[in-house]
Amino acid sequence: MPQSNIHPGSIIEPGAKIGKNVTIEAYAVIKGTVSLGDNVVVKSHAYIDGNTTIGDGTIIWPSASVGTKAQDLKYRGEKTFVEIGKRCEIREFVTINSSCQENSVVRIGDDCLIMAYCHVAHNCEIGNRVIMANNSMLAGHVVVE
């Protein structure tokens, strides 16, 4: 059975759930109640926080920031979620914020490519097989099918 490869220079908080055959590179940070599916790769300096679930086979590239606090003045610390589907690529310097209303979800479907420097704001929903080109930005509550 394949073993996970977790670099000793990464930071993983005790609440995280790590699937099978996961790779976490040096200086990656996993905080909160993050759940990584099987065969996930988290590259160096990626930052994953909050109530975030990342599906099997997804790759989080260097310096991506996933599950961080919503950039919305209405957000007051409610429990919110981020869900990223299977086989996605979240490229360099992408930011994916959490939602801003109690028990709401920012959702990215399966087989998506979110290219470098994209931003996905609070309460967005992205369907399956979506490609966001470099520097694309979604404001809050946007749905892309």
Where are the regions that the model predicts?
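Structural signal for interior beta-strand "rungs" in well-ordered beta-sheet cores
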Residues: 4-145
